[in-house]
Amino acid sequence: MKKIFSLVIIFISCTVFSQKVPAVNKTLFSKEALAQKITSQNGKKLSVSEVLKQHEGKILIIDFWASWCRDCILALPSTKELKEKNPEIEFVYFSLDRSHDQWKKGLEKYQIAENENYWFDEGWKNNFNNYIDLNWVPRFII
């Protein structure tokens, strides 16, 4: 009886506390997602669509990260190495930092200011991130 009770508790816990698996069958972004505004390092507001058009026809990896995210910081050396070994691949970094100042400090602290960086000034919950079911960082999209 104890085993059955334990199994039921484990099953309920796994069901209640499990994360939603993102839908992976999306092949195109919605108009709302592409219209999402992001801020470049020089303060210019662009849509996600404008950023993607700059890399049209090329292999592009979008790295979703934040300076407060330990796993994101640990992944930076690997993405740097991947970038160096594969110059044909282009990288864009989308930050989910809570403030513009945190983002800018993170770029300098982790020495990635020379990369193509953008910040979601509307925060985590925005049309683009909602469309891709972003629920954790780091996340990479190819």
Please place each PLM-identified region on the residue numbering:
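Bacterial Sec-dependent N-terminal signal peptides
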Residues: 1-24
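N-terminal "domain-start" segment that seeds a small globular fold
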Residues: 20-54, 117
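Short pre-active-site segment immediately N-terminal to redox-active cysteine/selenocysteine motifs
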Residues: 58-60, 64-68, 136
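Conserved redox-active cysteine motifs that mediate thiol-disulfide chemistry
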Residues: 64-81
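Short alpha-helix adjacent to the SAM-binding motif of class I
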Residues: 81, 102-109
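Thiol-based oxidoreductase modules, predominantly thioredoxin-like and allied folds used
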Residues: 88-102, 112-124
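Short, internal strand/loop/helix patches
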Residues: 108-141
